[in-house]
């Protein structure tokens, strides 16, 4: 069993950096943020400011870990983080929280969006009302926020998903280059920006390097970041494709649900390969029971801490532009790049 810890943070030995895109051109996100000059600065964010920190969904260990990092940063730096989400992942629920942030006088918002454009109008209204907007984990349109804190580029994460799959298949005795590998993607929805970008890159990588693989459902399987749906969808995949070799779950709710479905079917990692992204706490049971060989994660606590720090940094009157650098307490120097 192996965990690939992809992103911790750039100041740690051997780690790679988060990416942070500034408002501007579209496409891949980039490295971080800073003050309006090109030298690294350590300006302090405004003490007493309130950041509304919005996950895609509550009750999920990935987002709860992000909140831990956010709260630790806020306590250390003297501002407030209001972790406000809903157990049902939907545009309507997130819009309600955004509107409430405006009405209650928050200084900024840091949101992981459930939809790439569905929050745009609400966030633009928040900006007009004076709130600063940062996205993290999953983005919106560039003109609906100032900065995006991303865990990596689509290329990095999409290819990583396939490479973990190949590694686990080989450990089962499969030859990924020659065997006909039947596989499927199982994640949250067709509209979540981050997961779909990883899936697209991963699918292109498979077609280029493993043309012998067969996607049994090119429309993919979705479980809407709902734990029960993830289990149900996981069971339906196994029922519909009894000879499936690989299921890639690029979603922190889909992966444990799929693994539970595999375990319920009395299968192990010797029978089927399941991989993806999720936190150690949600996967350790299945690793111990030999249901999963390998999965990936990044340090979402650092990502959450960085998102709220930057949101409050902007709300404190600091300005950023592409090329700027800033020293974030406890994290290190980060740089704004075009997204």
Positions of PLM-derived features:
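Bacterial lipoprotein signal-peptidase II cleavage site
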Residues: 20-39
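Extracytoplasmic "Venus flytrap"
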Residues: 49-73, 77, 82-98, 112-116, ...
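Short, solvent-exposed amphipathic alpha-helices that sit
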Residues: 62-77, 157-164, 193-213, 229, ...
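Short beta-strand elements in bilobed, periplasmic/extracellular small-molecule ligand-binding domains
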Residues: 75-87, 182-185, 207-225
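Hydrophobic alpha-helical segments within soluble ligand-binding/sensing domains
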Residues: 94, 150-179, 230-231, 278-283, ...
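Flexible loop/hinge segments that line or gate small-molecule binding clefts
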Residues: 122-156, 160, 172-182, 280-288, ...
């Amino acid at each position: 069993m192996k965990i690939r810890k992809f992103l911790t943070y750039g100041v740690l030995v051997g780690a790679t950096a988060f990416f942070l895109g500034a408002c501007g051109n579209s496409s891949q996100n980039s490295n971080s943020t800073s003050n309006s000059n090109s030298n690294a600065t350590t300006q302090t964010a405004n003490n007493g400011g309130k950041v509304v920190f919005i996950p895609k969904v509550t009750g999920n260990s990935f987002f709860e870990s992000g909140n831990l990092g956010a709260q630790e940063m806020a306590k250390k730096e003297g501002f407030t983080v209001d972790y406000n989400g809903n157990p049902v992942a939907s545009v309507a629920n997130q819009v309600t929280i955004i509107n409430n942030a405006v009405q209650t006088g928050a200084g900024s918002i840091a949101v992981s969006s459930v939809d790439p454009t569905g929050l745009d109008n609400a966030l633009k209204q928040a900006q007009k009302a004076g709130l600063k907007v940062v996205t993290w984990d999953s983005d919106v349109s560039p003109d609906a926020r100032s900065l995006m804190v991303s865990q990596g580029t689509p290329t990095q994460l999409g290819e990583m998903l396939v490479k973990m799959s190949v590694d686990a298949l080989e450990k089962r005795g499969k030859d990924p280059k020659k065997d006909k590998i039947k596989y499927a993607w199982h994640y949250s929805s067709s509209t979540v920006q981050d997961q779909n970008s990883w899936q697209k890159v991963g699918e292109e990588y498979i077609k280029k390097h493993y043309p012998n693989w067969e996607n049994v459902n090119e429309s993919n399987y979705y479980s809407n970041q709902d734990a029960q749906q993830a289990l149900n969808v996981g069971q339906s995949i196994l029922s519909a494709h009894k000879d499936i070799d690989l299921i890639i779950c690029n979603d922190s709710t889909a992966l444990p649900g799929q693994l539970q479905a595999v375990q319920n079917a009395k299968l192990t990692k010797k029978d089927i390969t399941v991989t993806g992204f999720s936190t150690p706490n949600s996967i350790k049971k299945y690793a111990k029971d030999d249901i999963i060989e390998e999965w990936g994660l990044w340090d979402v606590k650092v990502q959450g801490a960085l998102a709220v720090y930057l949101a409050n940094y902007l709300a404190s009157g600091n300005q950023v532009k592409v090329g700027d650098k800033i020293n974030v307490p406890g994290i290190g120097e980060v740089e704004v790049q075009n997204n």
